[in-house]
A protein has these predicted regions:
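The feature captures the conserved acid-bearing segment of alpha/beta-hydrolase catalytic domains
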Residues: 190-274, 284-288
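A domain-start/cap signature at the N-terminus of enzymes
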Residues: 2-83, 108-111, 140, 169-193, ...
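A short acidic, glycine-rich active-site loop
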Residues: 136-142, 238-247, 335-339
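C-terminal/domain-terminus segments
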Residues: 318, 327-344, 365-367
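Mobile gating loops/cap/lid regions near enzyme active sites that modulate substrate access
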Residues: 280-286, 308-324, 328-330
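The conserved beta1-alpha1 loop
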Residues: 85-89, 196, 220-221, 318
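Serine-hydrolase catalytic machinery in alpha/beta-hydrolase-like enzymes
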Residues: 60-73, 79-167, 176-180, 184, ...
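Non-transmembrane alpha-helical segments in soluble domains
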Residues: 106, 149-152, 253-257, 349, ...
Length: 367
């Protein structure tokens, strides 16, 4: 019987039909994968704007590790100009956050006269306040706070930025790192803006907050599929990038308001900025009588002394997803809705630059 099977001639025609069918299935799967990638993940890069300044690469050694960064300095930047740190998300680098912000901070730097630095994380992620995550190299946690402090000192010496006007912001993992700076290095940063990030819950919290505070903005989308606006576990589709539990965005704002001793009722303003998109601003600040009583200390950045600068603002993008809204680049659909307004970089700069902003409305992203 076996000999008969081996002697039987193969049916070449059937074999070719089967092979063709398999190839069609394979091509269909490839086409489907390409379509899914194009729809959910691919997003064309924005055009590089005409900028006045120069972008340079830099490196320093901190804690035995080589740390790298990009610096943008506008043409004719005067001495004593502000400095803005912009931190990237997980698995990204400085080049990606430039794209992710639509080069918005460099556009603003040209207009308002400040320097921008984009530091790179050493590992896959920034070593933020979350306990969940891989932040170790050779058995020791990476000291990202130390790196950023050394970087600021280096830039102060090289481009003569104003020590009293250093601001920090970041998106996603960079936003979580911004929260750590606000807690552990508040005296070094006049204001901090965390985007697509919330304060970790107590069981997922490892930071040691300093005694004083600084102004903090939290900007989150209500439809963020990765960092839940209402609080809960940080993850993507329940499968990827699990980062532990976080507080809600409102609770995160209240957390910093309590730290900054802002006990009054916050001011709230809601503004429609596009079809299906509205911006809710919740601003915690000192009561008018306390501000008047401390008017002689208006230049003091310590929240426990005057509080005139230690405000807290939650910017809730209703109808927004995971990332910083701006007009020049749409984020991948996998990260949720990507509204082109408000102008996130402009909102952050207005909050950071204004030492004691009054409650206001969002007008195309500018307070």
């Amino acid at each position: 019987m076996l000999l008969l099977l081996f002697k039987r001639k193969p049916d070449l025609k059937k074999f070719l039909h089967l092979l063709g069918f398999c190839l069609l299935i394979l091509l269909g799967l490839v086409a489907l994968a390409g379509a899914l990638f194009g729809y959910f993940i691919y997003s064309p890069e924005p055009a590089l704007p005409q900028l006045s300044g120069t972008l340079t690469k830099g490196a320093i050694e901190v804690g035995g590790l080589k740390r790298t960064y990009l610096t943008y300095v506008p043409r004719g930047l005067p001495q004593g100009a502000p400095l803005v740190l912009v931190m990237h998300g997980s698995g990204e680098h400085a080049a990606e956050i430039r794209i992710g912000t639509g080069y918005g901070f460099e556009r603003l730097a040209d207009e308002h006269g400040f320097a921008v630095v984009y530091p790179n994380a050493y590992t896959f992620d920034w070593n933020d306040c979350s306990k969940v995550g891989d932040f170790s190299v050779n058995g020791a946690e990476v000291d990202d706070v130390g790196f950023l402090n050394v970087l600021v000192d280096k830039l102060m010496a090289e481009i003569s930025v104003d020590r009293g006007r250093v601001f920090a912001t970041g998106v996603s993992a960079g936003g979580f790192m911004s929260i750590r700076l606000a807690l552990e290095a508040p005296s070094r940063f006049r204001a901090v803006a965390a985007v697509a990030a919330n304060v970790p819950t107590p069981e997922n919290f490892k930071c040691t907050p300093a005694g004083q505070g600084t102004s903090v903005m939290i900007m989150n989308g209500t439809d963020d599929p990765l960092v839940p606006f209402a609080g809960g576990e940080v993850n993507l589709l329940g499968l990827f990038y699990k980062g532990g539990n976080v507080r809600s965005s409102r609770e995160s704002g209240q957390y910093f308001a309590d730290r900054n001793q802002l006990t009054g009722t916050p001011d709230t303003k809601s503004t429609a900025v596009a079809d299906g998109v509205s911006v809710e601003q919740v601003l915690w600040h000192k009561a008018a009588k306390n501000m008047a009583a401390n008017s002689t200390a208006a230049n003091n950045t310590d929240a426990n002394d005057s509080g005139t600068r230690a405000e807290v603002e939650l910017v809730a993008i209703h109808g927004g997803g995971h990332g910083l809204p701006q007009a020049y680049w749409r984020r991948p659909r996998l990260l949720g809705p990507s509204p082109m307004t408000p102008d996130g970089p402009a909102v952050i700069w207005a909050f950071s630059h204004d030492s004691d902003p009054e409650p206001g409305c969002v007008n195309d992203g500018v307070r």
